[in-house]
Amino acid sequence: RSRGLGDVYKRQGYELLEKQSYLNLLLSRNVDAVLLIGSHFIENSPEENRYILEAASKIPVFILNGELKGDNIYSILCDDYMALKDMTDLVFARGSESPIYLYRTLNYSGQKKIQGFLDSCAEHGLDISQKNAFSAPGDLHKACSILEQLDADGISFDCVLAADDELATGAVKYALKKHLRVPEDFQVTGYNNSVLAACSTPEITTIDNRVEYMCVTSVSQMMQVFQKEIPPSRTMFSGTIVKKQTTK
């Protein structure tokens, strides 16, 4: 028992065939329910989500911070779209004129975040046909390097909104290397309200995406299903801006 399910939870690959294999492994263990953590389980193609629908025909499936419609599927998520839109509105209100966005992936959650950013930019008069969102799949050092390259390429930006706190930490590192005052000259925001936001100097303004609430709700709804009750198929929490030292 030292292998098997323990290895499933430790693996970091999320390719479709891997996900199907892991879910089938869980089903083979005759589990009572499945909790899928993260929107990386949700694909853009309905056909690629079929394996989840098939699993839900056998046992309840709960999706944490992702959404898929189907019988016996319960989605508990944060409103990532509105959270990022509100954060982008905030930096505009605090004087930013040319913000950019750093993201890791464009999964379900990632698409909601980037759309919130772009919609806010459009509402504030920015030309969103010009690229102002950039992929940054690496660690904080890679994020810093990407920003340095953007600057070298002549792309002007006075604020970085990041899809998570690690990317935001990379943006703070970039600002320090460029001798930019944060937040007077350069604003930075993160996402997830993780320990990285608190460990950074200055501490990073971030978004609390209510992970604790989502976890408690998912377990509560799972118990309701076991007791033959019918919880809502979709539960959405609002993200909260945690104002710290990297925004004006």
Region spans (language model):
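Alpha-helical structural signal in soluble globular domains
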Residues: 51-55, 115-124, 144, 149, ...
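Structural motif
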Residues: 10-28, 84-85, 135-154
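Periplasmic-binding protein-like
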Residues: 31-40, 100-103, 133, 154-164, ...
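An alpha-beta-alpha
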Residues: 85-126, 131, 233-247
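Flexible loop/turn connectors
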Residues: 148-248
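Hydrophobic alpha-helical segments within soluble ligand-binding/sensing domains
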Residues: 72-101, 111, 119, 139-148, ...
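Short, small-residue-biased leader/transition segments that mark boundaries at the very start
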Residues: 2-9
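Flexible loop/hinge segments that line or gate small-molecule binding clefts
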Residues: 14, 37-82, 86, 166, ...
